[in-house]
Amino acid sequence: RAAHLVSGRMLDYIEMEKGGFTIVKMRPPMELHGFTIGESKVRSRYGVTVFGLMSPGEPFEYATPDTLVSAEDVLVVGGDATLLERFANRR
């Protein structure tokens, strides 16, 4: 777990099954800043699902296609551990 948190944007990492489904809390890659979840096509492009996000000073909100992502947000993302690592290491 610690190795995953050292690199990339991951803030927290929960492996639900060894090498399989994983949930991470992470800063969004720059390419998502200013775009909605729908516009960024995270699931189809990267194979991971954004479940929700936390904006500074705001409560957790479940993500919808219309959820706008900013640089200060923290995303809650789930999927295959390998795909999540790739997504978290994007610039």
What are these regions (language model features)?
Residues 1-33:
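Flexible, Lys/Arg-rich cytosolic regulatory linkers and terminal tails that connect or flank
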Residues 28, 33-91:
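Cytosolic Rossmann-like ligand/nucleotide-binding regulatory domains
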